[in-house]
Amino acid sequence: MAGRNFLFVPGPTNVPDRVLRAMVVSMEDHRSPKFPALTNEMMPGLKKVFRTEHGTPFIFPSSGTGCWEAAVTNTLSPGDRVLAARFGQFSHLWIEMCTRLGLDVQIVDCEWGTGVPLQQYADILKADTGHKIKAVLACHNETATGVTSDIAGVREALDEAKHPALLFVD
């Protein structure tokens, strides 16, 4: 590759020809019949990534909203209360989905781009002594606004309140 130096810096940088050729191959659709075979090959590697010998990684052939729906409908029932903060487009969409599925969504409206309001979550969870809240929702990385929420802080709020609610993280 005369005249092309490959520097491994954030960019911009030249891309090797073999990588460029690989980029022109069509992607396999995540709903195609071939997709399950591709994912089976990844399972041992995923166990390594997630540092588990006994856990089973799940790969959903859907968009992220399909994963939300699977998690919510398989663990909660219509009428169950969930705690959720609205601070960007994806947290807003998750709240809308939960509402359509018949959940009682306790919404904490925040300025978009601020992330999960830890102190408000902690206060609400401590006040919920009857444990009516069955799940707490948190968008880790709110793509639309570019904010990352402190998920460990949400877990800590649940633990400090000795609250049994499930923690759902997108």
Model segments located where?
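Active-site-proximal loop->helix
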Residues: 93-106, 111, 119-124
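Conserved PLP-anchoring active-site segment centered on the Schiff-base-forming lysine
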Residues: 76-92
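Active-site phosphate-binding strand-loop segment of PLP-dependent enzymes
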Residues: 116-170
